[in-house]
Swiss-Prot record:
Pfam families: EH (PF12763). The lineage of its organism: Eukaryota, Metazoa, Chordata, Craniata, Vertebrata. The keyword Nuclease does not apply. InterPro entries: EF-hand-dom_pair, EH_dom, SYNRG. The modification Phosphoserine is found at residues 473, 580, 720, 752, 772, 812, 852, 855, 909, 919, 935, 1006, 1073, 1075, 1087, 1098. This is Synergin gamma. It comes from Homo sapiens (Human). It is found in: Cytoplasm; Golgi apparatus, trans-Golgi network membrane; Cytoplasm, Perinuclear region; Cytoplasmic vesicle, Clathrin-coated vesicle.
Amino acid sequence: MALRPGAGSGGGGAAGAGAGSAGGGGFMFPVAGGIRPPQAGLMPMQQQGFPMVSVMQPNMQGIMGMNYSSQMSQGPIAMQAGIPMGPMPAAGMPYLGQAPFLGMRPPGPQYTPDMQKQFAEEQQKRFEQQQKLLEEERKRRQFEEQKQKLRLLSSVKPKTGEKSRDDALEAIKGNLDGFSRDAKMHPTPASHPKKPGPSLEEKFLVSCDISTSGQEQIKLNTSEVGHKALGPGSSKKYPSLMASNGVAVDGCVSGTTTAEAENTSDQNLSIEESGVGVFPSQDPAQPRMPPWIYNESLVPDAYKKILETTMTPTGIDTAKLYPILMSSGLPRETLGQIWALANRTTPGKLTKEELYTVLAMIAVTQRGVPAMSPDALNQFPAAPIPTLSGFSMTLPTPVSQPTVIPSGPAGSMPLSLGQPVMGINLVGPVGGAAAQASSGFIPTYPANQVVKPEEDDFQDFQDASKSGSLDDSFSDFQELPASSKTSNSQHGNSAPSLLMPLPGTKALPSMDKYAVFKGIAADKSSENTVPPGDPGDKYSAFRELEQTAENKPLGESFAEFRSAGTDDGFTDFKTADSVSPLEPPTKDKTFPPSFPSGTIQQKQQTQVKNPLNLADLDMFSSVNCSSEKPLSFSAVFSTSKSVSTPQSTGSAATMTALAATKTSSLADDFGEFSLFGEYSGLAPVGEQDDFADFMAFSNSSISSEQKPDDKYDALKEEASPVPLTSNVGSTVKGGQNSTAASTKYDVFRQLSLEGSGLGVEDLKDNTPSGKSDDDFADFHSSKFSSINSDKSLGEKAVAFRHTKEDSASVKSLDLPSIGGSSVGKEDSEDALSVQFDMKLADVGGDLKHVMSDSSLDLPTVSGQHPPAADIEDLKYAAFGSYSSNFAVSTLTSYDWSDRDDATQGRKLSPFVLSAGSGSPSATSILQKKETSFGSSENITMTSLSKVTTFVSEDALPETTFPALASFKDTIPQTSEQKEYENRDYKDFTKQDLPTAERSQEATCPSPASSGASQETPNECSDDFGEFQSEKPKISKFDFLVATSQSKMKSSEEMIKSELATFDLSVQGSHKRSLSLGDKEISRSSPSPALEQPFRDRSNTLNEKPALPVIRDKYKDLTGEVEENERYAYEWQRCLGSALNVIKKANDTLNGISSSSVCTEVIQSAQGMEYLLGVVEVYRVTKRVELGIKATAVCSEKLQQLLKDIDKVWNNLIGFMSLATLTPDENSLDFSSCMLRPGIKNAQELACGVCLLNVDSRSRKEEKPAEEHPKKAFNSETDSFKLAYGGHQYHASCANFWINCVEPKPPGLVLPDLL
């Protein structure tokens, strides 16, 4: 996104499209056109539910954060990418209008129809009011923004290529962290109320306005949005959004994203949001917080009670709060995400308002509506009461959820025409969740007001340039499809029209989507050259980085399109499918009939998706796509159309097959996908199924799976900031679509590359791919979905990465990986990760707890852990991939995919192939899931593999299956390549690859064999490895990574260490199991992350404490053992681990060839955070050294270790002096802490690790004379002591031990001989 300063003006592909549309000019425009957001939005809506779709289109866009691209496409795309330009405001507006719905929509399920109706009405009123305000605001702002955008565009336009990218990179590099963090930090808290609309707009604006900053912002925004969307989208959104995959995200995003967007927007554009109280967003808490958070009289007693319980003179005691929060039953990663979203003041400690926010978000999340951003809480008139088993007081207040639903219902009424069906369908299929989704969903779509406003907004937007532009652009681009699309689009714009046409259109869109994919794929290939220029900003770099530059754009575009398109279209479709078996048939019927037109729509959808993607990552891609897409669409469209029409004709067959496949074939394929389907709801339509999967995921078991997909969508959306948006959905879809979509991609690519005939063959091959997909179907079922999701994630990650990388925020790029680790991108990534976690949490307890350790510990890890359940695996896969792999594997997947795609829709091909080879992958993923840690990466890898496979497939369209086999083998490299590419985009990736590969190989040296699946596992491990690898690989980024990680760790670790320390006694085992996987993996690649050790440490702290184990161990420890030997043994291990940590830090810093880079790394927040962690480790060694002396335990090995540690430490001090981090000698002098024989309770006071007095701190405080020694324990973590297994520990000792030595503290006893 950031990459596309010119295009997105800070948006990204989507932004670019919007911008292009508005001011981005032709360049952007293609994206807009390609994106065809309005239509795309329409598409997705259509897909979601025919009736719903039509209405949804306008509103859906608003409704779906993801779909964000749909109407947002016009607006959203603009919003995300270029929308800020002309359309952006409109989009923003529509978005805004929908934002409320979005936010509200998810809760639907929990309320009765009457309640929903009431809510809907209330929401409608509110919405109408807001709409009026927003309308004025929007118009006013639109002018300003457009002016600005045009200005920016005119100034940035020339730079769209490398320059823009460089600028964006510079800006992002400079501001990404701050921005991301800022956006994340502030927007989240502050993006609550009415802000959504304007904020989004603002966001769009920012996107547009701030060419560099904006891009950054967009990036952040998207990221934020993605994150937010992710959480809410997944839980909240998805159920509702079920109907609209895109919508799911958008719902999430709309509410969350919108809020998030607003946040970011607010932050960045707070100025711009004149009437919307943008600034508050920067004021993280208050402005956007609902009154019941800061108004004491409105705060529920339950909240107050918890506050009283946890409040201490020094503030809220995290240790006391932890068990209460854990009693919510939410996965730790989810709680970690909520925490990360709410904790804006003091890392590790919550303020009263933040506590209320956390409780409210937990309550919302428990209702199945991921509270991915505090802003979402504004939808609740009253504070939602969380259900905390540890707290009798808290009773859930259904009303709060209704608040969300109202928006849905509000829309619902307007949408009643088509929406009711959808809503009903949704409800039916979704079941409870469906109901929620449907009501929320329908409402959202229904938000006719929204629709109308959106329509109006949209029209304005269109008038503004986006909608018209997009539409026209699309038309122009699509040429054929253009007219149909335009009409569709317009229909989409006009809810009523769309409503009617929606069904047909929907099918069309589905087809269209693929058409788009195909077209894009084909055109992309053909237009590759152009895209590089366009997407060139981002892609160009990537493309250039990757030889497949064009392919990549294609790939990315495709992936994203597929993601977006597929996602959007299919999600919608699926939603329809998922939503109701009826719909799918309708869709099916519609699909074939509308295929021709559907193709167009599909394109639109794709474009929408693209926009989404664009908005996400593919903003570039989108732009890419858009320029390519238009051609693609046109060319492919024609092909597609012709192909499409004769569903079974070779090319047409392929297209239609794809489309139809999606519908029928895919329905079959996707029936399997349906399998995938665990999200069986998806079965009805293949691609729809994909979406259905998404939807189903979202809603049901499918909900679960769908959620993952949806989550992905949300994730996408969330990650969208990254490449989250379409990618995720796309991935799932891609996976399912993969055959169709990827085939489409391949086919289209091939079509465009090789022509219709080839396209047909390709399609056929791809269709086999589709069959393969079927093969994958099973694979897909569990794995493909995950892979797809993964891919989406991967794409997203890639996109994210691209964005980051392109943003010149390599660190960002890496950080994303780290971010996955929840480090560098603490805010964005962490939030992302958290959101992912949240989503995962939404997805399922399995994922949650799978992820929980990791999540908290390592969002990335959590991402990796996620693959605990099959569906969850998918979810997680995408999710996990997203978070951890998101940066790495996912990125890899995506990136590679993109790359491949760029090289001919390879991405899809690989995807498909992967899917084909995916069976093992699926298994792998599942297995990996079990690996908890590995699984995430596995999934990611799978995604990668898949992508790779697809790539191969693309390469060998005709020998698709063979390709699968051979590509499987290649996959490892592809995966690796991908990873590399993601990493470095080839060069970087190559370096990375080794790390990834190394991890991979280490984990699964036979990635080639199972290519996707094994690689995935490896990669999963690799993910960590990758993370770690990444870390090492980042030499230059090492710091960033490290800092990122450490940073994450610092706040995360602090929380973790607090939580973990608490965890030690409380949640150790739960955390541990997951964390252990993480840790194992982390540990397996310990050197890769010095930071990681810390991070890992926190992880481990959380994860490792296995209470039972510890107790057993304690039994052994406390038992009469050869004390001296045991002390020597335990300390030897401790010092050995500490030496590794310190050495890793030293080697990492020594490995940075450039002193300026090294200094920058060390002085960065993350670098300092990391080094402080190393200092803590060193301080632990100093304490242990005293313990060794005190107990007179002598051993050559210990002496040698201490010497080595001091030697490395002295070397490391030189680096620390660069950041004034060199610890005061006194802080390393713990002699005052030594327990002497005469001391009473000496054994009770002795730390189980170092045998020093755990209370020495307070004692020092009593003795001012020992001011300096007091410093030894004056860090925040020093103030913690933990009691575990009958022993007390210094928090830092226990933390280090658990994270770096083993999960169970040693429980050493002070010898009596003293």
